[in-house]
Each structure stands twice: as structure tokens, then as C-alpha cells.
A protein has these predicted regions:
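Conserved alpha/beta catalytic core and glycan-binding cleft of carbohydrate-active enzymes
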Residues: 344, 359, 365-529, 533-534, ...
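Substrate-binding/active-site clefts of carbohydrate-active enzymes
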Residues: 136, 172-345, 352-378, 420-421, ...
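Glycine-rich phosphate/pyrophosphate-binding loop
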Residues: 106-181, 187, 415-502, 597-608
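Short catalytic/ligand-binding loop motif for oxyanion handling, primarily in non-cytosolic enzymes
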Residues: 86-90, 177-179, 219-223, 279-282, ...
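Hydrophobic faces of well-ordered beta-strands that scaffold small-molecule active sites
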Residues: 167-169, 211, 271-273, 348, ...
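Short, flexible loop/turn elements at secondary-structure junctions
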Residues: 32-34, 58-60, 70-72, 83, ...
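Carbohydrate-interacting/catalytic domains
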Residues: 1-169, 174, 503-508, 512, ...
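Conserved, mostly hydrophobic/aromatic
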Residues: 30, 79, 171, 203, ...
Length: 691
């Protein structure tokens, strides 16, 4: 038993990691397989003054632990960890650095970047092989003990939207709310603003079922961005896997996040979090020591097998989290369960998800992480979405995730963009339209496994996709060298905004084509926030550092074309939601598909290799007769500039009624009762149904 001033520390227990309040005191437990001792540092409410330093008295199963009686929620703390400073063997212990608890449920303060954050002498020629003795505590956030009783979800139920009914809306807490005048100014840019009635009602009015939020785990602003007057806007640089990003706090603090989830659930909308477990904000061997690196670098990160000083960089960020280590895997699983059970979210999208399936020999869809999730009684019921790639060997794994997972399908994105540019991808386009069975009709996976998208946070918005040939990222301060160059975009005659009515008309029609393709494709559609009314980032396709009006959604003074596009999008979503044949549930659900060419005959094998107009008849004869439910639909696609006479076949009985067109010149409600040539406008889609 060790005492320090007014504090006493007892043995405590090792089975629950983090700082856990039991009503009488707080148990502290932290994993480190290679540390020699660990000190718990307690701070006054300001976080500026250390009031006690207590050595954790016990070491059990590689867990350092101790119990502080009478300590209450709200207490601030950090760790100092002692051990070898031996970078060449993968160890970077430095007790001069105050470290953030990997299990901290809340952090107080921001990182005030200082040379003291680095475990080595920055100006020394030997760099990270040197040792720095400056104290980083004055410049480092403090961890806060929370009261678990505040997370009360009794008598609450999740919306539990079936995958086949889901429509995902990707957005950003601050970006979505900062400029919305319908939200009270004090809570704009916060969780409370995201959960405000104005936000929830708008998303509900579109017909969205599931909101996917860009990262909300705690993350810092990188020094190099601050030096340029920029910030880490997207948040893909996590450090606290259990702690919400305090930059999104409103007056209610952490409770604002829970209230946001409740508000969406009350509206029948799911909340999905974009999570970043593949790397941390500590960078490579020359990065700062903030948490994992100083606690047990060799365990938490994957190092080069023959040079442990250096990190495997399959993420492109400098380090890679070592989820093949059982304790690191446990941390990720504990984090997921915390957000699922204590914060009550409904699913996760895993950034660079291939990393999580990497074992020492490479990616394995039966690897430890996937097995752990599959058998977990809580997580296996949630929506799990992988970004199925990283930059390491064999990192591209689209179609390679295990059953139960959805995947961002970039083949869908690229093919659809190419098709509407007029490229020769008809065969691939057909496969993407019908759920990418070539990728997902395996091991009992369903069409919903393909998360289809045209745009996402990373890349052009929909408006910019049809307005710019090239990226314009000058505001990022990297001489326009950042961001993707291969955008498969087209400006149709002018770069950026123009007064040319003809060009603007084409752009609006192409937006309708993209949205119609997305929402009538089998699979799970994901819409980028603001695309429904033509939000622009002025050609910036990499807004990761733009916490500014470049990335924020603009709500006021929208042109009539924006309002018209929004209403068109609502109509598309309503059609998808009400018509089962537009949202396939299974590869074996009785759906009948007939592809035909502009002459009305069956699409021939040689025609699949040509860029061409195409038609498809989708039938569900297995559906029970019900008023308003379609059993048959015709979709016609023309990606080319000129109109095409398209022979409408008369399969079945009753003829056809024109339900929807993306062109301005076709007649809504037009009825066809006999085989005839229909003038399919250039760059358009037409949907027919039975009367």
C-alpha cells in the first residue's frame, strides 16, 4: 500500500482496464508487457497542478493496477511509465512524458505542441536514438474519470434497420451544423447541434435511415496544420478510442453525444461511427510520445521485423496499430463495445479496414479481429462496414471481407462515374447496378454487402464531380499536390461555376443521373451530405484540413436548382423505400433480370464490350399482390450526348407507364400500350412501371 499526501492506493484488480469508478473509489489498470513500473499522476480540477503521484502497486498478467479509495468521478489523471529507452529494439519508454490512458473515457484540454512531447532531442543529429528529459505534462491533455451511471439506456431500443432497407448519409458533426441558422448558435458545430430538431427533422425528411458520422473519437490538430492556420477537420488521426472529441462538445459536454443518439433513435434513424483503429496520432519514429508509444511501443505498434526502430506503415500515416497482439485487439473490442453499449451507437465504418485483418503473414478474413467480432453477441448484431483497403502488400480487399460485413465498393464508384462520362464500361456497369454479385455472391453474403457510393468525404462532392476536370486544393497549403488526381470527373465545358445555361443544364441532369443510379442500384446506397442539393467545395477534393466554409454545408440562399434537386432526391428515396424490386434482399429472392438493347432485343455478348445505351427489365413475380407495389419495372440508360430511339418491349401484360425521367423533356405519366420506339434523351435515365 502506497500513500501520497491525502491519497491512498491499494492493490485493486486487473480484469477491467481503464479508470473505473465503483461508487467508493476508482480502480486504475493499464496494459504494458515491457514496462518496469508505472506511476499514476493525479491533478487538480484545472489540470495544471499535480496533486499526487502514486506508483501502481500490482502487476498481474501484464496489467499494472491499483485502487484509489474515495476518489470521485471528475478526477483528472495521466501516467508516467518507466522502462528501457531502446528504439533499436522497439522500446521508447520515457517517464518524463505524461501519457494519455488508452482507455480514458474523457479528455480535458488540447495538446499544446511543444518540444517536450518528443521522447528524443529534436535538434540532435541522432534524432530518436537520443533521450529527452523535458516534462510534457504542462502541454498534455489530462484524462478524466467518468461516472458510468450517467450512461442510462434502460428501456431504450435501437432502430435496427434491416440492411436491405438502409440508406446511409455520410456527414460531419461540425460541417453539417455550423452554418445552419435553424440551430441555436451556441450549439452549432456540436453533438447537441447534430441532435437538434432541425438536424434530425431534415435528415428524416429525406428518408435517410442511418447517419454515418466522420470520426468522433478524440483527436489532436497536427502541428504542421496549425503552423499553416489549418486544422484536422476530418479527424482521421485518433488518440482516444474511448473518448469523444471534445471539440464537438456543447454546454452538456459528453451528455450531448448521448442526447444526439437518443434524438436520432426517437426519429427511427441509426447512428454509425467512422472509426480509426488502424493508426494513431503518434506518427513514425520521429513522432511525439503521447500515449501508446510511451506505454508499450513494441506491443501496440507493428515494427519492421529486422529493424524494430522503424514502423510498418501500411496506413500511410507513419505507424500501424498491432491488432494481432491480444491485448491490443482487446482494446479495440472493448472500445467498440463501449460505444455500442454505453453510447448506444448502431454500427461502425472501419477506416482502412484491411489493417484490422492483418496477421503477421498478411490479410486474413478469418483473422483474430474478424473472429472476435463475429462471435461477439453485441457487435455481431450491429452494422459493420469496412473500407476494404490499405497501402500495404495485398491491401486491396474489395469483396474479401467475411460474411456479415458491408464494404465500401469503390469499383461501384469508379464504374458509375466512367459510365456517365460515356466510357466503355457497360458490362461492369450492369454488374454494379445489380449489387456486384461478382464480388459478394459468396459464402452466403447478401447484395447489401456492397455499400454503393458516388461520392464520399474523400474526393469531389457530386456538384464538383460534374463541374471540375481537375482538383483545386490550393487552400490546403500543399501546392495542390495533395488529393486524388484520378477523379473520373467532367466539367462539360467550363472549369467551376459558369453562367452558361447549357453547361449548367447538363450538370444538373448528370447529378440526377448519378443519384438515380445510386438509389436504384441493388446494394446499400450511401449519400454524401449536401449532394442532395448540390453542395460544392469549390473543386477541393481533399478537405481534411478545411475547418472552414469550404467543408461546411451551406443552408441559406440556395438557388432553385438546389431545391429542385433535393425534392428529386427525396422522390428517389421514397421510391426505393416503397418498391422491393429496387432493393434486393437476397441473390435468391426470385428476382428476374432481362437486359435488352436499344432495338428492344436481348443484349448480345458483343454489345457488352461496347459503350452503349442499355435497358433492363426487373421483375419480382414472387411478390404478393399489394396496392402500389410494382412487380415489373423497366430502366433505360443513355450515357451519351445525343438522344437514341429505344424500342420498348411489351413483355407481360398491361403496357408501361413512365414513372420517372432524369431529362427535362420527357412526359411524366406517359403510357405505352404497344411496342414502339421511345426517344431516350441524351444523358438520361427513364423508369417505366406497370400501370
Amino acid at each position: 500500500m502506497t500513500t501520497n499526501r491525502a491519497f491512498e492506493i491499494r492493490s485493486g484488480y486487473s480484469h477491467t482496464l481503464g479508470a473505473n469508478y465503483d461508487g467508493e473509489g476508482v480502480n486504475f489498470a493499464i496494459f504494458s508487457a515491457h514496462a518496469e513500473r508505472v506511476e499514476l499522476c493525479l491533478y487538480d480540477p484545472s489540470g495544471e497542478h499535480e496533486i499526487a503521484r502514486l506508483e501502481l502497486p500490482e502487476y498481474t498478467d501484464e496489467i499494472w493496477h491499483g485502487y484509489v479509495p474515495k476518489l470521485q468521478p471528475g478526477a483528472l489523471y495521466g501516467y508516467r511509465v518507466y522502462g528501457p529507452y531502446d528504439p533499436e529494439n522497439g522500446h521508447r519508454f520515457n517517464p518524463n512524458k505524461l501519457l494519455i490512458d488508452p482507455y480514458a473515457r474523457e479528455l480535458v484540454g488540447d495538446i499544446q505542441w511543444n518540444d517536450a512531447h518528443f521522447a528524443y532531442q529534436l535538434l540532435h543529429d541522432d534524432k530518436d536514438l537520443t533521450f529527452d528529459d523535458q516534462d510534457s505534462a504542462p502541454f498534455t491533455p489530462k484524462c478524466r474519470v467518468i461516472d458510468p451511471a450517467e450512461a442510462n439506456w434502460e428501456d431504450r431500443q435501437r432502430p435496427s434497420i434491416p440492411w436491405s432497407n438502409a440508406i446511409i448519409y455520410e456527414t460531419h458533426v461540425k460541417g453539417f451544423t455550423q452554418l445552419n441558422s435553424a440551430i441555436p448558435e451556441p450549439i452549432r458545430g456540436t453533438f447537441e447541434g447534430m441532435g437538434h430538431k432541425a438536424s434530425v427533422d431534415y435528415i428524416k425528411s429525406l428518408g435517410i435511415t442511418s447517419v454515418e458520422l466522420l470520426p468522433v473519437h478524440w483527436f489532436p490538430d497536427d502541428q504542421h496544420l496549425l503552423d499553416k492556420g489549418l486544422k484536422n477537420f476530418w479527424g482521421y488521426n485518433s488518440l482516444g478510442f474511448f473518448a469523444p472529441a471534445t471539440r464537438y462538445y456543447g454546454p452538456k459536454g459528453i451528455q450531448g453525444f448521448r442526447d444526439m443518439v437518443r434524438a436520432f433513435h426517437d426519429a427511427g434513424i441509426e447512428v454509425i461511427l467512422d472509426v480509426v483503429y488502424n493508426h494513431t496520432a503518434e506518427g513514425n519514429e520521429l513522432g511525439p510520445t503521447l500515449s501508446f508509444k510511451g506505454i508499450d511501443n513494441f506491443s501496440y505498434y507493428r515494427t519492421m521485423p529486422d529493424q524494430h526502430r522503424y514502423y510498418i506503415n501500411d496506413t500511410g500515416t507513419g505507424n500501424t496499430v498491432n491488432t494481432s497482439h491480444p491485448r491490443v485487439l482487446q482494446m479495440v473490442m472493448d472500445s467498440l463495445r463501449y460505444w455500442a453499449e454505453s453510447m448506444y451507437v448502431d454500427g461502425f465504418r472501419f477506416d482502412l479496414g484491411t489493417i484490422l485483418g492483418r496477421e503477421p503473414e498478411g490479410f486474413d478474413q478469418r483473422g483474430g479481429f474478424f473472429d472476435a467480432v463475429t462471435q461477439d453477441p453485441v457487435l455481431a448484431k450491429l452494422k459493420l462496414i469496412g473500407e476494404p483497403w490499405d497501402i500495404g502488400p495485398g491491401g486491396y480487399q474489395v469483396g474479401g471481407f467475411p460474411p456479415g460485413w458491408g464494404e465500401w465498393n469503390d469499383k461501384y464508384r469508379d464504374t458509375v462515374r466512367e459510365y456517365w462520362k460515356g466510357d466503355n464500361v457497360t458490362n461492369d456497369f450492369a454488374a454494379r447496378l445489380l449489387g456486384s454479385g461478382d464480388l459478394y455472391d459468396l459464402r452466403g453474403r447478401r447484395p447489401w454487402s456492397s455499400v454503393n457510393f458516388i461520392t464520399a468525404h474523400d474526393g469531389f462532392t457530386l456538384n464538383d464531380l460534374v463541374s471540375y476536370n481537375d482538383k483545386h486544393n490550393e487552400a490546403n497549403g500543399e501546392d495542390n499536390n495533395d488529393g486524388h488526381n484520378d477523379n473520373r470527373s467532367c466539367n462539360y465545358g467550363a472549369e467551376g461555376p459558369t453562367d452558361d445555361e447549357g453547361i449548367n443544364a447538363i450538370r444538373e441532369q448528370q447529378k440526377r443521373n448519378f443519384l438515380t443510379t445510386l438509389l436504384f442500384s441493388h446494394g446499400t446506397p450511401m449519400l454524401l451530405a449536401g449532394d442532395e442539393f448540390g453542395r460544392s467545395q469549390m473543386g477541393n477534393n481533399n478537405g481534411y484540413c478545411q475547418d472552414s466554409e469550404i467543408s461546411w454545408v451551406h443552408w441559406d440562399n440556395l438557388p432553385e436548382t438546389a431545391n429542385a434537386l433535393r425534392e428529386f432526391t427525396r422522390h428517389l428515396i421514397q421510391l426505393r423505400a416503397t418498391q422491393p424490386l429496387l432493393r434486393r434482399e437476397s441473390w435468391r429472392d426470385g428476382l428476374e433480370i432481362r437486359w435488352f438493347n436499344a432495338g428492344g432485343g436481348a443484349q448480345q455478348s458483343e454489345q457488352w464490350d461496347e459503350g452503349s445505351t442499355i435497358g433492363v427489365c426487373i421483375s419480382r413475380p414472387d411478390l404478393q399482390p399489394e396496392a402500389g407495389i410494382w412487380h415489373d419495372a423497366l430502366l433505360l440508360f443513355n450515357p451519351f450526348e445525343g438522344s437514341v430511339p429505344f424500342r420498348i418491349p411489351m413483355w407481360g401484360e398491361g403496357g408501361w407507364v413512365l414513372e420517372l425521367t432524369t431529362a427535362d423533356n420527357a412526359q411524366q405519366g406517359m403510357r405505352i400500350t404497344e411496342e414502339m420506339d421511345f426517344d431516350l434523351a441524351g444523358r438520361s435515365i427513364v423508369l417505366f412501371r406497370r400501370p
